[in-house]
């Protein structure tokens, strides 16, 4: 990118120097073991480098009457001193010199006597060489970065195409770990009962398949839900009547010996007119076994609204039920009224509209209570 600091000339030239050094085939053995091959190898490698690397001092012309432009090549920095300048002394037409990577150079042919005049390396000439080489290396660096950027962009586009191909549906292309609109998450399960609450505002879901105590349950629904619907925060008469009528029907339901594991995927709907949780508890106590079946991915909590103590006192002092063999059902059915009475005696502990997930405020399902008792 344009904001990053470009690499320095030494960093850019590092790989180039290594490549030139090893391409020159340096002789690491002592010179006395193989003296004749030293000079030709360096001269030939320097000529090969001339075709690959351009030197900025290539256009420098040697001085002399018949001398033409010198052929300057770039050799290895490490062996610059060992490379000799060769010229045709007889004719004096041209000379072949070697300049180092740092800017060293050889001289052109003399005016006829074959004398080699070395070129004076000025600071401006070296700076010019370094500037041009730096521009050349930066250009190569940008080209390499551009190629890598295009590859990354292409791979990103391929990834986007794969995601689009997978689609949002739960089909064979459905990806894992990505939440989409069509996925069945716990949030969707929690929102289903809320959407269905508007269908039944009468007080209880019509999902009871009971023959023996259907009449008593319908009476309980009519009295409890009706009382809760017309009750207010200070209205104690209607709420009390709903609570007192709910308990005997609970006993009849418990004595009937019916199955309590009916699977209903609805919370008990809250009526619009209900302002206190007393009528809600007294209403759903009668069929708590049916409406409060095990709900997956749901957290059972209650909203507590401050109410007067007299409003919930009838439900707190419910009559003792007749003894029967379903002791677990009786205990679980009695628990909401007990917790409600405890909550009503301390109305200032809870703030309006807040949810308090305290263990004592939960309603225990009979199956869960039986499992806990067995453990």
UniProtKB/Swiss-Prot annotation:
Residues 245-254 have a biased composition (Polar residues). Keywords: Biological rhythms, Cytoplasm, Nucleus, Phosphoprotein, Repeat. One of its GO terms (biological process) is circadian regulation of gene expression. It comes from the Eukaryota. Residues 92-113, 224-243 have a biased composition (Gly residues). One of its GO terms (molecular function) is transcription corepressor binding. It is found in: Nucleus; Cytoplasm, Perinuclear region. Phosphorylated with a circadian rhythmicity, probably by the double-time protein (dbt). Phosphorylation could be implicated in the stability of per monomer and in the formation of heterodimer per-tim. GO terms for cellular component: nucleus; perinuclear region of cytoplasm. Residues 69-91 have a biased composition (Low complexity). Residues 28-118, 140-189, 220-254 are annotated as: Disordered. Forms a heterodimer with timeless (TIM); the complex then translocates into the nucleus. Essential for biological clock functions. Determines the period length of circadian and ultradian rhythms; an increase in PER dosage leads to shortened circadian rhythms and a decrease leads to lengthened circadian rhythms. Essential for the circadian rhythmicity of locomotor activity, eclosion behavior, and for the rhythmic component of the male courtship song that originates in the thoracic nervous system. The biological cycle depends on the rhythmic formation and nuclear localization of the TIM-PER complex. Light induces the degradation of TIM, which promotes elimination of PER. This is Period circadian protein. It comes from Drosophila capricorni.
């Amino acid at each position: 990118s344009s904001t990053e600091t470009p690499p320095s000339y030494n960093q850019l030239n590092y790989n180039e120097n290594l490549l030139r050094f090893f391409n020159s085939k340096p002789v690491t053995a002592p010179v006395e073991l193989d003296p004749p091959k030293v000079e030709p190898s360096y001269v030939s490698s320097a000529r090969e480098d001339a075709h690959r690397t351009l030197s900025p001092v290539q256009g420098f012309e040697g001085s002399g009457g018949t001398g033409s432009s010198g052929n300057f090549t770039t050799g290895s920095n490490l062996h610059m001193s060992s490379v000799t300048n060769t010229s045709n002394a007889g004719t004096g037409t041209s000379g072949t010199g070697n300049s180092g990577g740092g800017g060293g150079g050889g001289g052109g042919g003399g005016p006829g006597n074959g004398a080699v005049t070395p070129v004076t390396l000025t600071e401006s000439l070296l700076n010019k060489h370094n500037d041009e080489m730096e521009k050349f290396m930066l250009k190569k660096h940008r080209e390499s970065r551009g190629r890598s950027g295009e590859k990354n962009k292409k791979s990103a586009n391929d990834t986007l195409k794969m995601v689009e191909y997978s689609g949002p549906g739960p089909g064979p292309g459905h990806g894992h770990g990505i939440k989409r609109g069509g996925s069945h998450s716990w949030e969707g399960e929690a929102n289903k009962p809320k959407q269905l609450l508007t269908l039944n505002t009468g007080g209880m879901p019509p999902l009871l398949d009971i023959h023996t105590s259907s009449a008593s349950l319908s009476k309980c629904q009519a009295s409890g839900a009706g009382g809760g619907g017309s009750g207010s925060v200070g209205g104690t008469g209607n709420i009390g009547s709903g609570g007192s009528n709910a308990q005997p029907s609970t006993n009849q339901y418990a004595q009937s010996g019916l199955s309590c594991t009916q699977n209903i995927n609805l919370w008990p709907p809250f009526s619009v007119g209900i302002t206190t949780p007393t009528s809600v508890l007294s209403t759903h106590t009668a069929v708590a076994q049916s409406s409060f079946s095990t709900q997956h991915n749901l957290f059972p909590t209650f909203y507590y609204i401050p109410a007067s103590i007299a409003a919930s006192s009838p439900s707190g002092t419910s009559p003792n039920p007749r003894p029967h063999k379903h002791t677990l059902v009786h205990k679980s059915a009695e628990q909401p009224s007990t917790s409600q009475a405890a909550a009503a005696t301390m109305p200032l502990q809870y703030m309006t509209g807040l949810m308090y997930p305290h263990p004592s405020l939960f309603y225990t399902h009979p199956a869960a209570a039986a499992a806990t008792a067995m453990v």
